[in-house]
C-alpha cells in the first residue's frame, strides 16, 4: 500500500513537472487591437487586414493584430484618445482628426496646396511633415504608421459652375469645420452646416444645392443620385493614416517584431494607395454612368479661386504657420 502511494505521488509530481515545463516553454503571443470606423469591404479595411496577415505570418504567430471595423471600438476621436491611454493599440483617423490634438497637422489640410497622390506622398515625406509627426510621437505618444489615400475633395452640385463667380450660386453643405466654412465663405458661396447623414435629404429638399467630399464617399452613400455636376476643384486632398500607441509599440513588441510591424504597415499603406488610385477611373465611370457631368475649370478660373481663397487660408494657419508654407507645399509637387 505504501509503495503504491509513493508511486502515485511520484507520478503526480512527474505530471506536474511536465505540465510546468510545457507552460514555461509556450510561445509568447502578443495581441494588438486595431480600431477602424470604415466597413470591411473598403480598401482601407482591406489594407488593415493585409497588414494583420503579414505581421502574423512573419512573426510566426507571435503577434496577432485583431481588426475591429465598422466602429466597433468607437469613433476616430475615440481611437486617438484610447491609444493615448493604452486602451487600444492601433487606430485609424483622417489627418484632420489629429488637428484637435496637434494643430500643426493643418499642414495637410491647407486649401489649394496638394493636387495629386504623388504630391501628397511628397508632403508626407517632407521635413515639415516629419517634424509634425515627431511632435505627435513625443508629446502625445502616438506613432504614425502610414498614410492612406482618400483622393481630392471636389464640389458636387445641381448648379452649373464653370467660373469662379458661379460659386455664388451655391448653398454648400459643410461639416462643422472652421477651415471649410471660411473657405467657401471666401468663395462667395453660402455655407450651411449639416450632418453627413443629412446630405441626401438636404439635396432632395433644396435646403442645400451643393456639398464637398471625396468621390469614393459620394458613391458609397449614393449621393450621385441627387447631383448633376462634379466640379473638380481639388480644394483639399484627403489624407488619412494608421497610427499606433507608442507605449504598445515599445513595450509589447520585441525589436525584431517592431521592424516587422513597421515594414508591414509600409507595405499595407502602399497597397492602399496603389489600389485606391487604380479604382479612380472606375469611380469616375460610375459617376458618369449615373448622369453626372464632370466640369474641369479653366486655369484662369482656378487662379481666381486661389486668390479668393487667400484670406481663408491665412485664417486657417494663423498662429501656426507663416503664409510662406503655402508655396512651400505647392512647390513639392513632382
Predicted regions and their residues:
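N-terminal secretory/targeting leader peptides
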Residues: 23-119, 128, 137-139, 143-334
